[in-house]
Regions:
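Positively charged n-region of N-terminal signal peptides that target proteins for export
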Residues: 1-4
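Bacterial N-terminal signal peptides
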Residues: 6-16
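Predominantly soluble domains enriched in secretory-pathway, periplasmic, or organellar proteins
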Residues: 17-323
Length: 323
């Protein structure tokens, strides 16, 4: 009997240990892809349908095959490149060139430059809104967003944001949300009228940079460097739902609706991975180690892989993370 009780106690102890063990995301580095050339980087955009990954790199954009990870092309002459937006229905892509205060338009098939549009000062993040067929370029030093017709490249308007814009997302229903880095706010825009509808504070978060969106629960996931927090917002009311700690120098966020995972990548060299338990509850699964300075990423919604730019011993490298 004593042996039986001891055995049962041991089993229960192991079960308790398993129950208390922290859940893991399963993400780890599965491939390191070296890219020729030196220089910094910023945003990564994954075209899930076309199976391409666009990576900003100094004065050009590197284009990778999303499945083989091979470098398939380069888009040159994009000085101070920051972001890339894809308008697949028009066969066009749009690149912010921060040093020339312009947006460069390119052909998605040939990667050839089609034109250039002058915008505000130091354009940074850029996104395509499928509801209006417009491209929104965030002018970091002009406190504004330039709105471009994706079909013909003409400027349809400029929105005064009242602060320095960082990342932006669209809900596909006529709403655009933009983080203001210096104001620690998320701005709600009517993408049809180009009117500012709301300025929503992100307190206790400060220095708002990264932003992602879940269309099903209508939740925004803002990454804030000040306080090192992810702030979850209601996209309809602007109410702060909850906050969660993340690493330092966050600069990109992503949401995977299939796995119900939220990602926040940070310059401290980690990606915080949260599970969305419900619309209002989020559990930290893991802080996945990447590389110091690897503050941005792109999510492939088909394979659930992450593409993370890094500087590995002086070599520009794309870290591919999978499960």
């Amino acid at each position: 009997m004593k042996r039986t009780l001891a055995f049962l106690a041991a089993i229960l102890g192991l079960a308790g240990t398993a129950t208390l063990a922290a859940p893991q995301s399963g993400y780890h580095i599965i491939k390191k892809v070296p890219i020729p050339g030196a220089g910094g980087w910023d945003y990564v955009t994954v075209d899930d349908a076309a199976r391409r990954v666009y990576v900003s790199h100094a004065t050009q954009v590197e284009v990778l095959n999303a499945d083989t990870f091979e470098l398939v092309g380069t888009i040159p002459n994009t000085p101070g490149v920051h972001g890339i937006a894809i308008a697949s229905e028009f066969g066009r892509g749009f690149i912010t060139a921060g040093k020339s205060d312009s947006v460069i338009i390119f052909d998605l098939k040939t990667l050839k430059t089609l034109g250039e549009v002058k915008v505000g000062k130091k354009p940074d993040a850029i996104m395509y809104d499928p509801a209006t067929k417009h491209v929104f370029a965030m002018n970091g030093d002009s406190d504004s967003a330039t709105v471009i017709n994706a079909a013909d490249g003409t400027v349809v308007g400029t929105i005064d944001l009242g602060g320095g814009p960082e990342f932006a997302v669209a809900d596909g229903k006529g709403n655009v949300y933009i983080n203001l880095e210096d104001k620690a706010e998320t701005v709600h825009i009517d993408s049809n009228t180009l009117k500012v509808l709301h300025h929503w504070p992100l307190a206790p978060g400060k220095t708002a940079t990264a932003l992602a969106f879940d269309p099903q629960t209508r939740r925004l996931f803002a990454g804030c460097r000040g306080g090192q927090l992810m702030v979850v917002l209601d996209a309809d009311t602007g109410r702060v739902i909850t906050t969660a700690p993340i690493g330092e120098r966050v600069d990109a966020a992503a949401y995977d609706p299939t796995q119900k995972l939220v990602f926040q990548s940070t310059g401290g060299g980690t990606i915080a991975v949260f599970h969305q338990d419900s619309a209002d509850k989020y559990t930290l699964l893991e802080n996945v180690v990447t590389n110091p300075g690897s503050k941005t990423m792109g999510l492939d919604l088909k394979t659930h892989r992450l593409f993370v730019p890094a500087n590995l011993e002086g070599t520009f490298t794309i870290l591919v993370l999978g499960q």
